[in-house]
Design a protein with these regions (language model features):
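Phosphate/pyrophosphate-binding catalytic cores of soluble transferases and nucleic-acid-acting enzymes
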Residues: 1-155
Length: 155
């Protein structure tokens, strides 16, 4: 029977070392569910595994995207489940490691289909942000959806 092993917790508590040591003992690969470690340009403050750690055991979803690429939890969930199915053809175990618990939950329980945001909308909002700043966007959100604004942690 195939098994997923999850190692989760906050940044810099030793998840990487523990997961590598365990993966070497049980001969398996590691899938990261740390949403900040996906991006090549985000090495500082994310505790991304060092090169000498990455060569010890095969890692997936580590610095595989650019911050300029659109990548959301729905895409991650689809990619991770596909990879898990492939890895289970050759491995009895897979280690999931990270601190982005919503991303872990998306693997285990699935996630509602997140609709794609048209690139024109993303571009328009980024332009508004560049030209008018975050305070303007917060005010706009409060006007358009006061209930969500009150529930969110953005103010």
């Amino acid at each position: 029977m195939n098994k997923l092993i999850s190692i989760s917790g906050p940044t810099a508590v030793g998840k990487t070392k523990f997961s590598i040591d365990l993966a070497k003992k049980i001969n398996c690969e590691i899938i990261s569910f740390d949403s900040r470690q996906f991006y090549r340009e985000m090495s500082i403050g994310t505790a991304v595994p060092k090169k000498n750690e990455l060569i010890q055991v095969k890692h997936h979803f580590i610095q595989h995207k650019s911050i300029h690429d659109y990548y959301n939890i729905n895409q991650f969930s689809i990619d991770a489940k596909k990879l898990i199915n492939e890895l289970f053809k050759k491995n009895k175990y897979i280690i999931l490691v990270g601190g982005s618990f919503l991303y872990l939950k998306s693997i285990i329980y699935g996630i509602n289909n997140v609709p794609e945001i048209p690139s024109e909308v993303r571009h328009a909002l980024n332009t508004e942000f560049d030209n008018k700043g975050i305070d303007y966007l917060r005010k706009l959100l409060k006007e358009l959806d006061p209930k969500y604004y009150d529930l969110s942690l953005i103010h």
